[in-house]
Amino acid sequence: MANPSGTTPLVVVNTTQSFEAACRALEAAIPAHGFGLLGIHDLGDTLRRKGVTFDEQCRIFEVCQPRQAARVLAADLSLNMALPCRLSVYTEAGATRIGMISPVAMLASLSSEPELQTVAAEVEATTRAIIDTAATPGDPA
């Protein structure tokens, strides 16, 4: 799994799949790894409906693992604003990409609580596995 610059909190993987195929693969991989899909936002369509010129495709998948979310909230209720996790499928310059903001990096910027770093590392391991599964053509979730 690659980071564009190596220092960014963005986790981005390129896939050879089409945008629609990658979206279907991600949707299948989410429950296969124990997460729930809370919603899908088609950002590209929303922008175009609002009259904004946007030539790329972008869908945001809001996902959650309830037990992990409860651990975050038990440690610091104000971190509800960082939930749920968001995974994204998008196109850029002809490439299809699947990505997220690193849960470890995000929670580290918001709290130094050791329990939160443990939860973030566990969540990141699973969400990276979700992305890797979805990015692999023909990989059954």
PLM features: residue spans?
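Terminal, regulation- and interaction-focused segments at domain boundaries
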Residues: A2-H33, D132, P140-A141
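A generic structural signal for well-ordered coil/turn residues at beta-strand boundaries
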Residues: T7-P9, Q57, L83, G94
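Short glycine-/small-residue-rich flexible loop motifs, especially phosphate/cofactor-binding loops
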Residues: E27, G44, R128
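Compact, glycine-rich, soluble single-domain proteins
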Residues: L38-S88
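Short secondary-structure transition/capping segments
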Residues: N80-A93, I131-P140
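Beta-strand/loop substructures that line and gate deep hydrophobic ligand-binding cavities in soluble
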Residues: R86-E113
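Well-ordered alpha/beta subsegment
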Residues: S109-A141
